[in-house]
């Protein structure tokens, strides 16, 4: 810019010097002309007027140059101000970007803390005493986040307003100085060098304008990015609100599942204790049986007896008992399932009847009053009749069974979650009648007498008394289930009751009873 100023000064000086030379040359020519042509005063007047016109043109050029210099100084100062303001805005945007990063880091830290707190709360069984104490910390965190977001939004709005005001100032400045200033480069006064210098100045001004527009566009893009990031932050805050609202429901569900599992564990413990008690009783009964057999074997030395344990193994009896226990358990499961299905069918029927009654009532209410009384009487007569009652839970109709020490396989099967999990996590459980263990000692005496070897009254008419059978007929089952059960039972091997067996009278009664039990086990297999 100082080079351009020097060129303009040189142009003005050359113009002034040329005008002075022309004036001096005109004066000399006028003297010569006056010497040659004396008395011609009109030519002098014309020359004076031309000199005055030239001087006025020079003054106009000087005023234009001064005006241009003033505009140039104003442009330089405005460019400096704009560059300083743009740098300040860039610094502010950088600080805002750093603040946004810090806010995002805080949000990530809050997410991690919320996750850890949620996991800890799920692990804990007890809930807080009131909802206000539970949601106080979460509410304070959300309030602080919302305050920070509002402050950042206000800062962005202020920056946007300042940028808009500066853009308006630049527009007014351009309209004021550039539209009014239109220099004619084709005039004869300016030379080629001056026109080139003015073109360079215009190019520089255009470059400054382009740079300012680019910077303004960059600021606008940064503002758009900032608004997008704020929208993203708002979405994250909403997601956090939803997550915080869902946390108590998840904790309640977890506590309910924990309580259900605790109930199931307690039921399992009770069943295990009952099975242990049964095992202890069975071991005692086994010891009593062994002592009785030993007492029976200890007879006088005059009589020679055959030891039944040399050829016959007492485990055959236990195998028979195990198989019968399995059959009893299968029948019990089938009876329970059928009772449940009948119960569900009856409930559905009752629900449909209720829905039909409500629908009929609505239809009767829509009828005119003359017909309504007749239909209401019929409906009341039908409503007085009772609906079909629900089927009660099937109770165990057979006698309680003793588990022997050799039933390890059955104990492993019964300890599975399908058998021992009496309280399911859904809250549904089996009926107490079908799951309670009857530990009555008086009812077990009759069964213990059955487990002992059969006593033969007469050796001439010998009949073998078999073990207790599985209860086949249950009065609470429907006809279809009974037919299916009989079809399934026909496929299974049967025990023959009261079958006469020929025995050797030479053998003692204990050995004969063991042989009878072995024969019974063979028939069962």
Curated annotation (Swiss-Prot):
Coiled coil: none annotated. Residues 479-494 have a biased composition (Basic and acidic residues). One of its GO terms (biological process) is silent mating-type cassette heterochromatin formation. One of its GO terms (cellular component) is chromosome, telomeric region. Residues 467-525 are annotated as: Disordered. Derepression of silent mating type loci when overexpressed. Present with 1910 molecules/cell in log phase SD medium. This is Anti-silencing protein 2. The gene is ASF2.
